[in-house]
Amino acid sequence: MNSGVSLCVLMAVLAAGALTQPVPPAEPAGSGLQRAEEAPRRQLRAVQRTDGESRAHLGALLARYIQQARKAPSGRMSIIKNLQNLDPSHRISDRDYMGWMDFGRRSAEEYEYPS
């Protein structure tokens, strides 16, 4: 759930960044103005090209993150299975609950569970 929300926020930020890029105004053709503005336009194109490359790299990272998020087990049951795999000598794993602690519980040797 958190990864889905963070993914949506990331996509919104990328979309907002794309929409806020400056667009050069259309001006009447003038030989003096064209020469003076050619250098800044070239620089702007180079910056846009670099920005596009970084967006492509960010898109590749985002695609890799989505693939890993889909492959990773999620939910309460996967966490419980991981906890049970950590300590195989734990006798009462089927009676434990996530986030619950009983400080007054007797040890497994002293207490016999009804079958």
Curated annotation (Swiss-Prot):
One of its GO terms (cellular component) is extracellular space. The keyword Cytoplasm does not apply. Glycans are attached at S31. GO terms for molecular function: neuropeptide hormone activity. Residues 1-20 form the signal peptide. It is found in: Secreted. Residues 21-51 are annotated as: Disordered. The modification Phenylalanine amide is found at F103. Residues 21-44, 107-115 form a propeptide. Its main location: secreted. The modification Sulfotyrosine is found at Y97, Y111, Y113. One of its GO terms (biological process) is digestion. The precursor is cleaved by proteases to produce a number of active cholecystokinins. Binds to CCK-A receptors in the pancreas and CCK-B receptors in the brain. Belongs to the gastrin/cholecystokinin family. This peptide hormone induces gall bladder contraction and the release of pancreatic enzymes in the gut. Its function in the brain is not clear. Binding to CCK-A receptors stimulates amylase release from the pancreas, binding to CCK-B receptors stimulates gastric acid secretion. This is Cholecystokinin. The lineage of its organism: Eukaryota, Metazoa, Chordata, Craniata, Vertebrata.
